[in-house]
Amino acid sequence: MREDYRNKRAVVIGASMGGLLAARALADYYGEVTVVERDALPDGYEPRKGVPQGRHTHGLLARGREVLEQLFPGFTDEMVAQGATAGDIVDKVLWFNHGFYLHNSPSNLHGLAISRPMLEGSVRRRLLQLPNIRLCERCAVLEPTFDRAQGRVTGVRVQSQGGSDGAQVMNADFVVDASGRGSSSPAWLDAWGYPKPREELIKIGLGYVTRQYRRLPEHLRGMSGAIIAACPPDWRFGVMLSQEGDRWIVTVGGYLGDHAPTDDSGFVDFARSLQKPEIFDVVRAAEPLCPLMPYQFNANLRRHYQELSRFPAGFFGVWRRLVQLQSCLRSGDDRCLHGIAGFAGMPGGRHARNCRTLLSGSEPAHRYSLANCRRQRSSTPACRRRAHDPGTLHQLVHRKILSRRPG
């Protein structure tokens, strides 16, 4: 720990994945890191009210798993010992995208199939083993305290739920907002006299339904998952991943209002309608383990904080405060971990400069779409052939999603 930070305190608003990982990064710098969470947190691996997406499909791609392993050494082996599935995401997962199957072959890109409650609960448990981490649950942050003369956030006003005491001030040298989509950061910034960031909204009309099933060895030819992507003009998709406890978690849905039904027969019929049959072949006969769980997400929203020339000192927003993305296709926690890997090296710096660093790789995805290569007038026959070549896809995934090459 740096000597000049030893006597300083950081406060993190929110104990979801973004908040837990931000706290872990800050623990290497600050003498005390306090995580403030409004929910009562479960002792085990249970879904909770503040994470409604936690009942749906989650997992870690290779880069996300690597960063988590760096933050918490031995994490992967610990999760596998408890039933999670680690494996080569190219060799052991069936991918169907834009009319082609990705050829399964070893890639040395190892992901982790794990439920969101188990992932979050395990990260929280490991985090609390650090001596300078403190958790304050069932405690709501009313607002950060702000010194207008210095242009600096100096702490947070908190209210304990169910307690008789009034609001109290928790002083801090650095405050991180990781409170999720419902954060009041835009309103706080406006009240402090800072400009609102430009917002970029893309309506997607996404809706999906999830159910868990009993997993048998003969399912999916022994593979650990299947992803059937939406390929326009067919906007329907399906995701099936192995989970701890010999379970499958299956999510089917669609974009632009083409949502999966929430009754048993409708759910199975929707799975039958997907472009490939692997998910349907499992759900039509497997034993359901829970009710059908719907989720809707209307739009992706990005706030361009990196464009602001002024921002309060001692204040930072991570994860969904910057980019709100739908989470059912596994990339959400990986983007969070990728951002934390960059954030870990620069607490205390200016927010706008840090945002420019963290978001420098957030170019529109269509620029890197292999299907786009096939559609371009200027594409050559060689380019079109390579558009579904696994080697080309490996390069795309390594460079723009997983941030590493195999080997």
Spell out what each predicted region is:
Residues 3-36:
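N-terminal Rossmann-like FAD-binding beta1-loop-alpha1 element of flavoenzymes
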Residues 25, 29, 45-94:
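N-terminal FAD cofactor-binding segment of flavoenzymes
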Residues 39:
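Residues in the short beta-alpha loop(s) of Rossmann-like NAD(P)-binding domains
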Residues 59-60, 106-125, 178, 184, ...:
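Short beta-strand to alpha-helix junction loop
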Residues 97-116, 153-155, 252-255:
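Helix-loop-beta segment of a Rossmann-like dinucleotide-binding subdomain
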Residues 113, 208, 258-369:
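FAD/FMN-dependent oxidoreductases across multiple families
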Residues 129-276:
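Predominantly flavin-linked oxidoreductase catalytic cores and closely associated redox partners
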Residues 344-407:
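C-terminal helical "tail/cap" subdomain of flavin- and related membrane-associated enzymes
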